Design a protein with these regions (language model features):
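Compact, glycine-rich, soluble single-domain proteins
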Residues: 4-91
Length: 91
C-alpha cells in the first residue's frame, strides 16, 4: 500500500505523488506516517519534511514557518506557510 502525498506552501504546490513513508517535525515531536495510519491533524514545527518514495527516492523539504499535517485514508497533506525542496525533484 502507498500514501498519496501533497506538500504545498502558501504560494505553490511544492511536491505531490505517491510515497511509502512521510516523516515530519510537529510541535509535539517527530511523526512517521505509513499506509494505514490513524487519521491525524498535527501542527508542524519549523524543520524538515522527508518523503520516501515507493521506488527508493527521497525528497526533503524545509518548512520555515510551520503549518499543518493532515492524514486521512492514506492521504497525507502538508500545508506550510513557507516550504522549499532541499533535495529530490518537484512533481
Amino acid at each position: 500500500m502507498s500514501l498519496q502525498v501533497e506538500l504545498v506552501s502558501a504560494e505553490s504546490k511544492v511536491w505531490s505523488g505517491t510515497a511509502r513513508m512521510v516523516i515530519a517535525k510537529t510541535i509535539e515531536g517527530e511523526i512517521g506516517v505509513l499506509a494505514g495510519h490513524e487519521p491525524t491533524l498535527a501542527v508542524l514545527a519549523p524543520g524538515q519534511v522527508t518523503i520516501r518514495g515507493e521506488g527508493g527516492e527521497t525528497v526533503v523539504a524545509h518548512v520555515e514557518d510551520g503549518g499543518f499535517l493532515s492524514i486521512d485514508h492514506d492521504r497525507v497533506t502538508v500545508v506550510a506557510d513557507t516550504a522549499a525542496l532541499v533535495s529530490g525533484s518537484a512533481r
